[in-house]
Amino acid sequence: MKKQIILSACLFAAGTLSAQYQIDLKNISYPKVEYIKMGNPGPAGQEIKVNNLYLTEGGVPQVPVMGEFHYSRMDPRYWRDALLKMKSSGVNIVATYCLWSLHEEFEGELSWKDHLNLHRFVELCKEVGLKVHLRIGSYCNAEIRNGGLPDWIVGNHNFRARSNDPLYLEYVRRWYEAVYSQVKGMMYKDGGPVIAVQLENEYVVSGQIIPHLTALKRMAVEIGYDVPMYTMTHWLDSEYPKGEIIPYAGFYIEAPWTTSGKNEVPVSNFEFFTYNRLSDNIGTDIIKIEGDVESLSGENNESPFFTCEVGVGSTTFYPRRAVVPEELAGENINLRLGCGANLMGYYMYVGGSNPVGQKRTYQSSGPRISYDYQAPVREFGTLGTVMQETKKYNYFMNDFGPSLAPAVAYLPTSNQKRENLQWAVRTDGKSGYLFCSNILYRRHRQDFKNVRFTVKLKDETLRIPRQRITVSDKAYFLWPFNQSLGKTLLKYATVQPVCSMKEGNETTYFFFEDDGIAGEYFLSAEGIDKVETVHAACKKEKNGWFINALRPGKDCVVTLNCTDGSIVRLVTLTEEESDQLWKGTNNGEDYVILTTSSLISDGKKITLIDEQSSAEAWIYGKGQFKKRTFQGEPRSLKATFRQLAPMDGAKAIRSVAGDLVCRGFYLNTIAEVEKAWLRYVADKQSYSMLNNQKVQAEEMGGYWRADVTDLVKAGGNEWAFSAPDGVMAELEILLSNGQRVIWNTDATWTSSDKQSVVTDCNLNKPSIFAEQEHLALYAVNVPDALQGDEETRAYLSYKGDVANAYLNGALIGDSYYDGTDWILSPSRWKESAAVNPLIVRIQGLKSADEPIYFEKDIHPADCVNPSLTGVEIRQEYRFPM
């Protein structure tokens, strides 16, 4: 009896497992496809049209790849390079915010020059071969002050901003007209690159969404924005102008705005396969359940699942300093595709630097300057960790988009139990892709053993793979089934597709084996004459060819000699090699190259980019990779730095007659005084006067310090000391526009009777800042950057809380400490730091218990007393191929 009970339990468990990994799509109805009326679709043969499921270009379904890049946050000399990096990594569309506050800091003073030259930016996009999605506001967010609304709009009490107040709409009309004047004649219908316009952003005023967005669209159309797509972000609410505007979704897994203190970001529904596009409980009206399958409700699905803010990197907020790992990108993209996303829009794809206004800096919750976002292309042109995973999926969407776009997502209802293995199927009823995710960001999942997926289609049942497998913690993947590869049919594969490459009558498909799951292919016998394998085993069976025992690598090649004379090759790479893959078109021909370097192609030449003086690339052609090496002339550039003492530039002075010493200073600025500190060395009886107010100073151990923020003013200032035995002092002023101003005691001071002061007094200058200040300053001499395209970068290693870099008093860079190197680019500085040093000001943590999230390898106690530990200069090398 006991044995019988055990056997029954085993059979029950096996049955439960089988049910969990089974999806029955035999009787599922495919949603009706209906096109949405937008603006002019563009030139004949290239029309961009959108239906309730996907986008077509020239009648061909596509899964476009869109990346966010803010032209106003980058030196325009580097726009082209960043755009080429986007295109070379598989991006098709550039999304960009037009940030009103940067263009019109003061009412009536619009600027379109330099980094604000929108017209030139859009021209460059066209030259490079990228389409443009304008996000014209008026409100944008973008982690910028007021979300991009100018202060003079926010402060205008004659209307309510972000409403249908007629006066506000007139201001918006004026802004829309100003933007349009820069892109007139550049719409897609004109042969230009502008294919879409986003109206407003994150507008969630209940009851006002439809009327306000409709009013903005009507205005934009009247002005001349005639484009294939009008869009909006669709956050937190299910109402939107259906049939008028396409809603876009956003998905951030690392989201610093969702948590505080040292807590991890909470797990959200975004980390599971789900149809809920907006939040945990909204957006369910488009879902229907048939049997054990969750799918789209064709009757209620009126818009495609498009995204504009899929976070593969993350911004940094002061309380949260997370460093995103490579797998963050792969996890998020894989989940979005498995849930049915048909436009992949990344935010951000290219990092940048906030410009500085005349009155203030423009940050919202992050650093004042840095908007690096840990993006695939980072603030100063280096590639982010997440680029490796991101570009693999980009190439997949580029090359397999025509078969992926019409494939509807079907989710087993077992996914609703979050502890179960998460998986999904996208299919048009015959072919498709199987997606699986067993990863949670910064958390562990169990390993799932004895997994084999069963997909029941109308005409057949697929069981993938042949032998049960273990899906380990952190695994995520997508597998194809019933996909046409040239004239052959791939019944299924347990390796992930990346891209394809055509060479005459030969086509190569590139896959990679990942996550400890053995790769296998099963191909229909039809259309194949002979199969040849290298580093794989092949068995001819009744219904096809079974290929397994793969040894992934550059030489793992399966060659299919087809009955029509064509050749199809399947190359199975390792995961590491797939990270190195670059795919593109050069001089009209496809290329696939493996390299650890960065790579760009302008369509005529391919260039490798590296911070080492040598590089190598493996170039694919005719079934094999061939290695090429490149060698540049090594260049050794060195930086020097020294720690600055308090009052580093001050001289000790005293009055000839023993009375007051004084000096007038003029603070020539329209910015506000954000912080001002007085530091001085003198005896206890001495005191300071600032603008006729006696300063209350605190002894810091070696010097006196006072917070004089409320005493310093724009314009004329009078500063005096009563110090018969002499004084040495500095006044450090930090302005709201990022400027740092220092006034020192020196020989230009006078006594109260206008006699010159003497500088022969002996005072002990402190060598370091007092412990209570948690402050360290350094003068960094950086060699002049080399001229040309090859960028020179400085990598600063430091410990502390917040670091700021000043060049001749102007703030040029900043960093919230997160344990990684702080990168700056001397190539982008408008002045040299070889003679006039860069001043690096590092503020330490007030205590080791500050409620700030750091990575586990950071010890906050080490950040209380700040320090700069190294400055490394790295020179970029470019190798034409």
Describe each model-derived feature in a short phrase.
Residues 20-93, 863, 875:
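N-terminal carbohydrate-binding accessory modules
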Residues 21-24, 39, 387-688, 693-698, ...:
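Non-catalytic C-terminal accessory domains or segments of carbohydrate-active enzymes
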Residues 79-145, 217, 221:
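Aromatic-lined substrate-binding rim segments of carbohydrate-active enzymes
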Residues 108-116, 138-163, 170, 177, ...:
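Aromatic- and acidic-residue-enriched segments that line the glycan-binding/catalytic groove
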Residues 117-128, 132-134, 157-194:
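An active-site-proximal structural segment forming one wall of the substrate-binding cleft
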Residues 171-236:
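Active-site neighborhood of glycoside hydrolase catalytic domains
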Residues 204-225, 233-274, 353-356, 416-422, ...:
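Substrate-binding cleft/loops of secretory-pathway carbohydrate-active enzymes
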Residues 214-231, 274-363, 428-429, 440:
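Catalytic-core region of carbohydrate-active enzymes that cleave or remodel glycosidic bonds
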